[in-house]
Amino acid sequence: MSRKMKQKNMRWLLIGGTALAVAVALCLWAKPGQPPDLPAEEAQESTIRFEEVQSAEIPLPHGLVLQDIGSYTGMYMEDGSNEILSNILMVTVRNDGDRTVQYAEILVSGEEETARFALTTLPPGQSVVLLEQNRMTYEGGRQVTGIEADNVALFPEEPSVHADKLEVLPGNGVLKVTNITGEDISGDIVIYYKNASSDMLYGGITYRVTIAGGLKAGETRQTVAGHCSAAGSRIMFITVG
C-alpha cells in the first residue's frame, strides 16, 4: 500500500499563513525539548544523547504522526552495525491508528537534499526513534520544503506473539523459547524483536531469529540473538509454521 502526503501536509501547515518551510525549520534550531526515554543498558554502553529535540506533531497517512525531530548521538541501529555515531538526524514517529504498521518510509525534504527514514513494525499507540538511513548529520537552521510518508503498508492481520503457545524470554545476546502447549509445533518459528524502553521503540529495524524445525511439546531451546538484551528488547510478533 503506497500513499504520498506531501501536498496535504503543506496545506495543513499553511493554515493561518504559516508556511511549511518556516514551521519545520523552527524545529531544527529551537531550544531543546524533552528527549525520549533511553534504554538503560544501551545508554551506558553507547552514551546515547538527544539534542535539539523539538516537537513537530505533523500528521501523516494511516494515523502516523511525525512527533519530534532533532539530533542523536549513540549506536546507529538502522543497519544492524551498532556503530557509535555523533549528531545523526533523527525523528520520532507515533502510530495513532488502530492497526500495526508493517512498513513506512518518512521523507523530509530540504532545499538541496532529502532525509530518508524507514520504520517497520509499529503497533498502535507506540512511538519509535528513527535515524536517517544514509547517516545524514543534523544541521541547525536547515529549511524543510516537504514531508512525505510513502510506501505505507499495514499488516493484513494484526500480528501475534502466540502467548498461548510460546514463552519467549529475552536475554543478553540470546532468546529462550519454550513450547508451553501439550503438542508439538512443527515448522519454523520466527521471532521478531526490537530494542525498546518504556513506551519508546528504538530504530526502524526489526530483528528476527528462527527456531528451525519447531519445538516438541514442553521443549525449551535457546538461540543466539545478537541484538537482544534482557532489559532493552521487546518481542513484537512471532510466526509459527
Where are these regions (language model features)?
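Hydrophobic single-pass membrane-insertion segments
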Residues: 27-37
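N-terminal Sec-pathway targeting helices
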Residues: 3-20
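Hydrophobic beta-strand segments
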Residues: 104-108, 188-192
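Asparagine-centered strand-capping/turn motif at beta-strand->loop junctions
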Residues: 92-98, 176-182, 195
